[in-house]
Amino acid sequence: MVAGIILNKITDILKNEGCSEVFLFGSHVTGRANEDSDIDVGVKGLDPSKFFSVYAKLDSEIDSKIDFVDFDEQSAFFNFLTSIGEIRKIG
């Protein structure tokens, strides 16, 4: 599981950029993460025009690979993750 301090930093960045909700999904939720795993983060409420600049900010400020998804744009994926229980709200 990814360290809490990293999750807090990710959440702080995303909330400051206007995200209303922040989610963790993937291997860090299912317990299959290893040292090479990326951190799968999804958001709701982010202005779509800010997506790439926010992703770049995460990339520059977090010393781990981030997979970043806008769940407002990918609602079917969000619903799927929710239905199988492989998502956790972190902010």
Label each region the model flagged.
Residues 1-23, 29-35, 46-91:
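Catalytic core of pol beta-like nucleotidyltransferases
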Residues 37-39:
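Periplasmic OmpA-like peptidoglycan-binding domain that tethers envelope proteins to the cell wall
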Residues 42-44:
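Short hydrophobic/aromatic beta-strand micro-patches
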